[in-house]
């Protein structure tokens, strides 16, 4: 059966300093500009597969057992941003999956990110809060099958991981007026990456971003004439 794989998320979660993701990483000292290479020529096409990631994670299972994994099984497997990049580097020799990808640039990016805790936090691959929304034709307890070989963009997975690792923490926008107005953005739900049968039943919900504006009381407000 044909397999579909796609990602969906908010435009506010781009790799740039002015966006929400840039403000999230700035809180831990990570320069989001270093990750913009994931959107540029040479790395933008970098992809990994769930099966390739599972091999990098060193799961003690054979090829036959891999084919029997279910969405429920993936909910019990955790991966970090470093693991995701390692999977892309490991897949560098696959001319079909990563043709033309600058592996040296990925190695440099990994070296930079390794020093940051947020890039080493491990999150579930599957489940309601997982990096992947994996849909099996027979349900969550049925084998994923060919879905494990579906190619997913590395940049999409890294973006999802960084947002999910931040949880639902608010990020100040710096657009307010002291004592009058404060504006904060909160990621209610991170972007999702979906894998499943190409039968119209494979779906993913977009990232939800909530804007909160607090208006304080101030009796005397004057503006320069």
What are the residue ranges of the model-derived segments?
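Primarily marks folded extracellular/lumenal domains of secretory and cell-surface proteins
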Residues: 65-174
């Amino acid at each position: 059966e044909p397999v579909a794989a796609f990602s969906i998320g908010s435009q506010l979660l781009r790799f740039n300093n002015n966006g929400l993701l840039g403000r999230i990483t700035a809180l831990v000292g990570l320069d989001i500009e270093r990750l913009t290479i994931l959107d540029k020529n040479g790395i933008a096409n970098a992809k990994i597969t769930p099966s390739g990631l599972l091999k990098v994670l060193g799961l003690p299972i054979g090829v036959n057992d891999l084919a029997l994994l279910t969405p429920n099984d993936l909910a019990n497997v955790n991966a970090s941003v470093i693991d995701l990049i390692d999977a892309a580097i490991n897949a560098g020799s696959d001319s079909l999956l990563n043709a033309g990808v600058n592996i040296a640039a990925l190695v440099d990016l990994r070296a930079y990110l390794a020093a940051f805790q947020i890039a080493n936090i491990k999150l579930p691959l599957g489940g309601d809060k997982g990096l992947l929304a994996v849909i099996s034709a027979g349900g969550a307890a049925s084998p994923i099958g060919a879905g494990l070989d579906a190619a997913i963009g590395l940049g999409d997975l890294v973006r999802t991981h960084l947002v999910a690792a931040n949880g639902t923490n608010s990020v100040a926008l710096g657009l307010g007026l002291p004592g009058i107005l404060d504006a904060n953005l909160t990621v209610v739900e991170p972007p999702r990456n979906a894998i499943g049968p190409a039968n119209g039943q494979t779906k993913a919900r977009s990232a939800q971003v909530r804007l909160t504006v607090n208006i304080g009381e101030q009796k005397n407000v004057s503006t320069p004439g």
